[in-house]
């Protein structure tokens, strides 16, 4: 049985997903703002976030909210971390790969997570200590023992483009062992796919915390491991934590092997969490 908070999160995520689907054939009418290079927001992002916030605030008025569009509001100790549309660039181009991501964070750690893909009607949920689920089916990370034959997911953060040479060096080294490396444009779905075994691992520097808060818990509850590029614990999700981070996620053996290649390539060495 799901926790009451997760039920509310699911309701909010499905409502936001409906907003995304209602506007998918009206993309040319949307007002789009370019916040920075390769970082966009649209009317749909704002509408979806408002739907989520309304639903969550109705049930839990005292919890804080950290949203991609609205920033940090209220209580830092217990808060919702929201990305109403992870994969905005995909959505705006009609590329069918994006999702809604919601996490409940207590004292800097995600305790509950929901990622909803409205196009495929795939609902990923997790609660700390209770495992991870895709559409009512328990999921687990893949059980590979090393990088050989792995399918890896990554992203190219617009905040790290000046150091792209290091990431490309890392990709070059990984392709000597991995089967393939994918760049889908939705970090939350990348992590959800790691959690259910569709991908073996995910790595990226410069990713925003609201993109990965829910996905981190999904991977952990699916038996996986999450760390930064130095092998340390993933960042706290509160007012003391960074806005962006480095992240590796997968089963523990693949994550450790991936981390060694990342370190040797120099990728992320000059990463600034304030960027």
UniProtKB/Swiss-Prot annotation:
Per UniProt, where does Mg(2+) bind?
68, 83, 85
Per the record, GO CC terms?
cytoplasm
Which metal ions or organic cofactors does this protein require, according to UniProt? Mg(2+)
Q: Which PROSITE patterns match?
A: IMP_1, IMP_2
**Which gene specifies this protein's sequence?**
suhB
Q: What is the enzyme's main class?
A: hydrolase
Q: Which residues bind substrate?
A: 68, 85-88, 182, 211
Name of the protein described by the UniProt record: Nus factor SuhB
Where is it localised? Cytoplasm
- Outline the subunit composition: Homodimer. The rRNA transcription and antitermination complex (rrnTAC) consists of RNA polymerase (RNAP), NusA, NusB, NusE (rpsJ), NusG, SubB, ribosomal protein S4, DNA and precursor rRNA; S4 is more flexible than other subunits.
UniProt organism field: Xylella fastidiosa (strain Temecula1 / ATCC 700964)
